[in-house]
Regions:
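Short hydrophobic/aromatic patches on beta-strands that form ligand-binding or substrate-lining surfaces
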Residues: 51, 179, 246-250
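Secretory/extracellular carbohydrate-interaction modules
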Residues: 201, 207-212, 217-276
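C-terminal beta-sandwich/jelly-roll accessory domains of carbohydrate-active enzymes
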Residues: 90-210, 221-226, 245
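Aromatic/acidic polysaccharide-binding cleft in carbohydrate-active enzymes
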Residues: 1-74
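Solvent-exposed loop/turn segments at secondary-structure junctions
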Residues: 1, 16-20, 51, 95-96, ...
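Extracellular/periplasmic catalytic domains that process cell-envelope and extracellular macromolecules
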Residues: 4-6, 42, 81-84, 142-143, ...
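Carbohydrate-binding surface patches
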Residues: 53-111
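Structural recognition of the beta-strand scaffold that forms the well-ordered cores
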Residues: 9-14, 88-91, 150
Length: 276
């Protein structure tokens, strides 16, 4: 649709892996979720294979063919990309109510080629179907509703995977952090494990009294953001904790102040939402 309606040839996924706490906005809209680094567990979301329908069937420099890009009569759309004597058709049928039979006619160097067919839907992703062979430069494909298809003259596609993904485990409890283990904090970008800054920037720093390290809020200027009234804060822990105690040694610097919150169940996104 981006190309058909607006001639857009590139879409940037603004982040690929969700490696932050589930109470933060947009937690599970990425292609992968890896939000428990203490366990090594991760989840591959079906969206990854939607990207594969492009990424494994075309390369940078391939061009869209205007004559092979269109909306489908019963819902969905398709685009065709080509390079040299190869081409790939990527079709989607979101919202379609019935199967659609699509007839393709090729010309020139595209005629007579063997075509691989791959499909993804909510039930199964990136499955190879029976190959097609064009006859007199023509081939027919039946597209099921709410599916993504790639039909291509290329080869070598595969669905990777890893069977030994560690199981998910809860955040370690009880938990204590002195930050003294970071003897070279610059190697970690001055960021400790497991904290997630919501507003401001919290970095590993020397304690004001010189007796070790601490976590220090280092951004002094107010950012121009969607939640201008928010105070700097960072989170750590598990949203499913029920009854617990939390303590912190606080060393205000230059007349500053600090606070400790518990049972944070949402961080807000700036759309009129406050931490609650």
């Amino acid at each position: 649709q981006n190309f058909i309606q607006n001639d857009v040839t590139k879409v940037v996924c603004w982040y690929l892996i969700s490696s932050f706490y589930s109470i933060e906005p947009y937690h599970n809209v990425t292609v992968m979720v890896a939000d428990s680094p203490w366990s090594g567990h991760y989840v591959v979301n079906p969206a990854l294979w939607a990207y594969a329908h492009y990424g494994q069937f075309a390369k940078i420099g391939w061009r869209y063919l205007d004559g092979g890009c269109t909306n489908l009569a019963e819902g969905g759309s398709l685009v065709t990309l080509a390079s040299g004597s190869d081409f790939s058709v990527i079709a989607e049928t979101k919202g379609a109510k019935t199967n659609q039979q699509v007839n393709f006619k090729t010309a020139g160097g595209f005629s007579g080629k063997k075509l691989c067919v791959w499909r993804s839907n909510a039930k199964e992703q990136f499955v190879r179907l029976a190959d097609l062979t064009s006859s007199n430069g023509e081939f027919i494909v039946t597209l099921e509703p709410d599916s993504i298809y790639s039909i291509s003259t290329t080869s070598g596609q595969t669905k990777g995977g890893f069977s030994d993904i560690p199981p998910a485990v809860a955040f370690p409890f009880p938990y204590r952090e002195t930050f003294d283990q970071y003897t070279q904090p610059e190697l970690f970008g001055y960021l400790p494990r497991y904290t997630a800054d919501i507003t401001g920037g919290f970095e590993i720093a020397a304690r004001p009294d010189g007796k070790g390290k601490c976590l220090r809020q280092v951004i002094s200027a107010q950012a121009q953001n969607w939640g201008p009234e928010w105070m700097p804060y960072t989170i750590i822990g598990d949203r499913d904790w029920k009854d617990y105690e939390v303590t912190a040694d606080v060393m205000p610097d230059g007349g500053g102040w600090a606070g400790v919150m518990g049972r944070i169940s949402g961080t807000g996104s700036g759309w009129g939402c406050n931490p609650k």
